[in-house]
């Protein structure tokens, strides 16, 4: 009742409700997620109380496709969880809980959200350019692979046939959804994957219930996140407004990463009056980012499908500071 009345006299909420934007739906998801964690808090000691945690994960997965604002609920959710599950709470524990919540936000915002598309694009490139299969064959394979692997991992946590199988299936699931692949490239992903593997295989006692909850949460986040398929379906219809035309996994990645808006250095880098840095011959010194892949136009019907690198991200000249 207090929360409803707070919204009733909130100018921000009503202003968002009357404009044709995503903020009203996003506010609804935010309120729903926090209400669900309070419901969990009231039944946390009962069997199957984790179903509220899994439902929260699903709502977060859906809300990611609406607006990333919902991720800001994670610190509050973690604090409620900490104060409910631990009896001897103190300032140090609260700060650690906040730190854990920030790590979760980073893993979702910079790991899962772009990492899923990143791994899917690698598989698509492998299937089309190396195996010479049709367009989107890699994406379809990756979709069924990730569903099958997560389902297998969930089954292993229920059956508990072997600790080794639980560890392997859990590790493969985390890697396939792209969580370790933070940022461009794969170096950070390899390091984080190795660290997770070391942690799993050096622990003698597994937190099977926690691993099961994590896997179920990842699965429902994946289901909610799949609403992004609407973007590809809509773009394939070639509607009048089709920004970036995200008709394949590569253009979808650029669309989700908002690459069309560009970027600017916030803490360190060039300023707006900075001059272009040049070498001794007067040629501008430039930096190439990762390749931007596009479908190659066929010259004949017998030609196999193929992606080609048409340009590079962050292709710009270095500027003096």
Show which residues each predicted segment covers.
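Conserved small/polar residues in nucleotide/adenosyl-binding loops
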Residues: 313-320
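Membrane-interface transmembrane helices that cradle and orient dolichyl/undecaprenyl
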Residues: 33-52, 79-90, 151-165
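Transmembrane-embedded, aromatic-rich helix segments that form part
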Residues: 29, 69-81, 113-117, 186-193
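Membrane-interfacial interhelical loops
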Residues: 109-141, 167-185, 233-255
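Membrane-interfacial entry segments at the cytosolic side of transmembrane helices
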Residues: 87-99, 133-139, 159-169, 185-187, ...
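Aromatic- and kink-enriched transmembrane "portal" helix at the membrane-lumen/periplasm boundary
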Residues: 1-27, 60-70, 110-137, 177-182
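Membrane-interface segments at or immediately adjacent to transmembrane helices
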Residues: 222-295, 299
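Alpha-helical transmembrane segments of multi-pass membrane proteins
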Residues: 20, 24-35, 53-56, 72-75, ...
